[in-house]
Amino acid sequence: MAILKSALVGFICFLHFFIVNASDNKSLLTEDIMASQVCNGMFAKKGKTSEITLKIDSYTSDFGGAIRLLIFNWKDVNAIGMEDDDGEKHYICNYEDIEAGVCKDDDYGLYLINQTAPHDSIYSAAVDAESMVSPLKYPVEQSGLYCVFTAPLEGSSEAYKITVTWENYFGNLDATDYPHLFLNPILLAINCLIGIWWSFIMFRYRHDLLQVQKYISGVVALSIVCTMVSTGYFYFANSKGYTTGSKVFAFFLSLAQSARQSYFGFLLLIVSLGYSIVVPSLGSLLRKCQILAGLQFVSSCFFLSSLFISPSNKESLVILFAAPVFLITLFAMFLWIVLALNNTIRDLRIRKQTVKAQMYTRLWIVICFGIVAYASIVAANAILIGIYGQMNYYLKYWKLLWFLNYGYTDILVLILMLTILYLWRPTENNRRFAMSEQVAQDVDEFEMTSSLSNDSLHLHHERPTSPANPHIIHGSADEHQALFAVDDESDDDASTLATSKQKPA
């Protein structure tokens, strides 16, 4: 059970890699050695105020002691600690160090600072928690990675809780989320331009639209809504902080992201099954696709909303329940898409429908490119963490985390969506190629989760154009555009369309 729980938590952390949500700009420190230190990026700007605020929430001590405190920019880390005559480095002044001459009586209990080493950001002091009425403020004058180290002055006799607030000059967002304020509006503008372009060609060829193209319009609309809500969320969180209003905003953002992700997967699935292009109707298979997408949407909503509202609570029961369901549905949909697309391409090639096979081959290339591109950034992160270690990786690349964690993924998804829209865009050839006798008569032959037998391939083949049969279309320059074989207005009249005759071009 413990292994399963660890695996689920690990999977949640992996999903957290590409989930776009804001990190709280507050950290909680306690006397526990594993929770007494924290580091975070900070941005500074001339004429603007950035500061680190420490507020003691609770404190208990048997001896009325104090809390040793150290705040510094990581670039000055080499100045922390003093070496004795044997070259051994000491970080906290104790009685042995005083006797050895490493530090003075006034330094007892404090973090030691090498005054001969260059530094300009280190603050070391013993804080009397009981007399500390107002929060301690540390001014940030240079952009960098800042750390706050604490420890009980009297050891295990003291217990405390300290809230550290990282207040950047631009607002309440964490430093790693700051690029959202620029990236999201750009993505929103691009998605709106894509929406205008798609609406124009949909209106231009409104009499030749296929049902699958109407489904594609839903992806465009959801992308605009998702980027709009995401932009509003981060601007609201930056302005108002992580309040109840921010959590409500985050909940709607989780709904939008879940809807876009599930719908996009559903669209890829029905396209891979040949809907509107190879077969006029999916029959009961369409309902199965909708059920799978619905399960993924519900589990994703629970999962994302829990992470948005409580980002630090990765082991809650809701997350531990929703994560495996989300994983199963995500894997099932991906596997189904791959199998369906592979079988569709194979069937089209067997039937010598080269133009359609080329369209689906291009879609396969786009999907493979997306998988390889995303896997590359995940692998690059894993390699860098393996080389530098998690802490040093963060210390070295914290300014690039916005790109590695979400910027790269957002840009990649936008490119993939735009490519698929271009391949499946409406054209004047929709009606022309609608009745080309390339439609399979048996929908069950496209149950892509099962193997295709040779006996199931006795379908209509494309025939070359001849004077005796001018109604059959074969090979033209227009075939290299985005071609659609079926003008499918609905599943109900699909069989009628499949048996209709095409007018001479």
Curated annotation (Swiss-Prot):
Name this protein carries in UniProt: Uncharacterized protein C26H5.07c
Transmembrane stretches, start-end: 181-201, 216-236, 266-286, 291-311, 318-338, 365-385, 400-420
Signal peptide: 1-22
Bilayer topology annotation: Multi-pass membrane protein
Main location: membrane
Top-level division of the source organism's lineage: Eukaryota
Homology family: Belongs to the LU7TM family.
Residues annotated as glycosylated: 25, 114, 342, 454
Swiss-Prot/TrEMBL GO biological process terms: retrograde transport, endosome to Golgi
Alphabetized UniProt keyword annotations: Glycoprotein, Membrane, Signal, Transmembrane, Transmembrane helix
InterPro entries, per database record: GOST_TM, GPR107/GPR108-like, PTM1-like_N
Gene Ontology, cellular component aspect: cytoplasm; cytosol; Golgi apparatus; membrane
Compartment(s) where it occurs, according to its Swiss-Prot or TrEMBL record: Membrane
One Pfam family of this chain: GOST_TM
